Amino acid sequence: MFERNQKTIFVLDHTRYFSIASEEYISMDFLKGKPSGDGGATGAAGNATGSGGSQFSKSLWTCACESSIEYCRVVWDLFPGKKHVRFIVSDTAAHIVNTWSPSTQNMSHVMNAMVMVGVPSRNLPTSSDYSVIHGLRAAIEALAEPTDEQLAAMADLGTDELSRIPNKGRVICITSARDNTSMKSLEDIFNTVLVQQNTLAAPPAKKGLIIDHCHLVILNIVPLGVESLVTNRSLLKISPLLDVEIHTVSAPDISYKLTHLILNHYDLASTTVTNIPMKEEQNANSSANYDVEILHSRRAHSITCGPDFSLPTSIKQGATYETVTLKWCTPRGCGSADLQPCLGQFLVTPVDVTSRPSSCLINFLLNGRSVLLEMPRKTGSKATSHMLSARGGEIFVHSLCITRSCMDEAPSITDGPGGRVSDYRTAELGQLIKMSRMVPLKVKDPSAPPLTRRLPRYFPLTTSSSILFHLQRHISWLSHFLHLLVKEDMDKQDEVRCQQHIHELYKSASRGDVLPFTHTNGARLKLSKAKDQYRLLYRELEQLIQLNATTMHHKNLLESLQSLRAAYGDAPLKSEPGASLLRSFTESPLSPERLEPISSVGASGSSNSNSLLKASKRRMSSCGQRSLLDIISSAERSQSNKRLDFSGRLCTPLGQVAKLYPDFGTKDKDAVTTGASITPNVKEESVRS
């Protein structure tokens, strides 16, 4: 309830330095005649009025005062009566401009008080009594004072539980320091006073509320074109009670800096409404397009956008923050069926409330009109994402639903991502749900199967993805056969029936009978295609039995099926038991079969040739089921088997590292040794001679 932005205090430096000009000169417009001086020239600080009075410059105090008042105007427009802002002016002492009372939390009170304070005089004496520290001390004391909401919470909880009331705040100090050392001393003084204030607020004194945390923002402003020795610093944790950040900014840009800061302080977003048609002030017969920047809650954008939409952003000249660009949509009459559902409404306020485009847009909305705003999609088309309207003298932005809403008709289950799917096993799924229904028991049955066993392990969602469940519509006994396979309490009679059905399948395969698929249209298939169909049928049948093999009867069925496949010439792969179970979960029944590894070590030449011939025939028969990667990989393996392996692997014992280039340098050593052995003989012969 009491967030850190609940309390914000501005401390304005009212010392002599803030009476100097900001060095940004503003040209004066004349209704008649031409200005005598150059309006774009920039003069000295002392010549603020320019040549002939055609230009003037604001003081540092005026820039700081205007920007801080605009800050609180935005806060009070978007959070009326919920967020509180106070002002403290500091020179020889701290001057309180307003309090936490709702009667002083308004623009009229603050502006009248600022007029009475006035611009600091240049004739003030240079003294250490003029300091911003007085205002910082008063700001900490103001944070300890409760607001009306905190007073109501104190009345509900009682005086003994004041520590349970959150009390956080933010202090924005606008001053000017010489260097980083001065800033460091300012931070240390603020932290010390903060700790002292919490000591006074603790029992038994109980002078105010304990400050849980404070965020200090120091804005060091300088005239335009003047370099400062104070460096910028991002948010830094000074102590558990204090976080400090420092920004050095020129006086004309302080309004942009505060607008950037307020976006993060109150979780706001900036939106620029572009292409607003407006009559020209000079020529009423023509019109031009203008842009107006507004501020609102960030949720106005976050709840609207879906994955198919992007927010077009841009950075305005002179600013450092991004603004979302939305285009003015010409108002048109539309019925209730053409309106999109509204996801939320949020208060808005213009950034520059005194500009002519902003005032025209505000008056247009306050007169009862509504404005639709468009945003471009990624595909290039446009969508109406927001709407501006006014009610009760307040302007709201409405976030419209640009994706599928809950009020739209739900999409059909047959409209899948790959096209229209019409063969879902809906009736079988309903029967499976009824069969899998569980009821609680008062006493746990130790003989009951575990919960994981009760869950179905294999259930194709569509008929086209399964051969077994596709054929049960055309083979009368297949439905009963599949029901027996998944029974948890299979007995000997059920096993015998299943054995008979499996033998019938193999008899029909040996006779060359074609499986009654609906897509064959009664045409006679080739022998190889018929064998492929039976092979896939046996594979899916084996997978189904393997997943339900919980009794000895299921295991007997599995062994008989595997033996029949071996007799038929379609034996399953011999691999680890865990690997076959993993493949049964991960592979589809229609996936291509794996190739058997060729193990010919220690066999005779004739047996090797026969096994290679069988393997090649098997590969040729199953090449239609293999992918391109399998074909290329097998070709690379066959080529690599023809080449000799690296001699380092062949000659090096197991566990040792092979030496690279073992004969490198041996020839040079032999030459040196031979030369050394020949030289003494030559010397001996010369001596003898």
From Swiss-Prot:
Belongs to the Integrator subunit 13 family. Residues 599-614 have a biased composition (Low complexity). Keywords: Cell cycle, Cell division, Coiled coil, Cytoplasm, Developmental protein, Differentiation, Meiosis, Mitosis, Nucleus, Phosphoprotein, Spermatogenesis. Residues 591-619, 665-689 are annotated as: Disordered. It is found in: Nucleus; Cytoplasm; Cytoplasm, Perinuclear region. Belongs to the multiprotein complex Integrator, at least composed of IntS1, IntS2, IntS3, IntS4, omd/IntS5, IntS6, defl/IntS7, IntS8, IntS9, IntS10, IntS11, IntS12, asun/IntS13, IntS14 and IntS15. The core complex associates with protein phosphatase 2A subunits mts/PP2A and Pp2A-29B, to form the Integrator-PP2A (INTAC) complex. The gene is asun. It comes from Drosophila sechellia (Fruit fly). This is Protein asunder. Component of the integrator complex, a multiprotein complex that terminates RNA polymerase II (Pol II) transcription in the promoter-proximal region of genes. The integrator complex provides a quality checkpoint during transcription elongation by driving premature transcription termination of transcripts that are unfavorably configured for transcriptional elongation: the complex terminates transcription by (1) catalyzing dephosphorylation of the C-terminal domain (CTD) of Pol II subunit Polr2A/Rbp1 and Spt5, and (2) degrading the exiting nascent RNA transcript via endonuclease activity. It comes from the Eukaryota. Its main location: nucleus. The keyword Cell membrane does not apply. Residues 521-550 form a coiled coil. One of its GO terms (cellular component) is nucleus. It holds the Pfam family Mat89Bb. Phosphorylated.
